[in-house]
Amino acid sequence: PVHLSKKYDLSISLEVAEHLPESSAETFITSLCEASHVVLFSAAVKGQGGVGHVNEQFLSYWQKIFLKKEYYMLDIIRPEIWNDEKIPPYYRQNIVIFVYVDTYKQKCGKNQENYCL
């Protein structure tokens, strides 16, 4: 994984992970988590197709890897953009946020509202 000297406000990986071999998946996610406690993420799902896609996976696959790193998934973007045809379909389908559990608890406390970040 990439080790940085500090954390950033946001780590972003949009439609990149599917281009890396499955053997690199956990290392890649670890690098994103090393960069920030909040990760904006999307990756091609199985059957999406595309040039150079070698590791298309359902979202649950990525969610399990992030959960090993103690990152919760927040699905707060897709409902807002689902019907916006100006946004490419693969973003509308695949984009989510992962947040480190302690950051989530600090920002949201007992508030279950996903928009508390």
Predicted regions, residues:
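Short alpha-helix
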Residues: V54-I76
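Short, surface-exposed amphipathic charged segments that create phosphate/polyanion-binding patches used
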Residues: D9, E56, K86-V96
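Conserved S-adenosyl-L-methionine
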Residues: Y71-N83, I95
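Flexible, glycine-/basic-rich loop-and-beta segments that form/coincide
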Residues: Y91-L117
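Conserved SAM-binding loop
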Residues: P1-Q48, L59-Q63, F98-Y100
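Short catalytic/ligand-binding loop motif for oxyanion handling, primarily in non-cytosolic enzymes
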Residues: H3, L20, G47-G52, W82-K86, ...
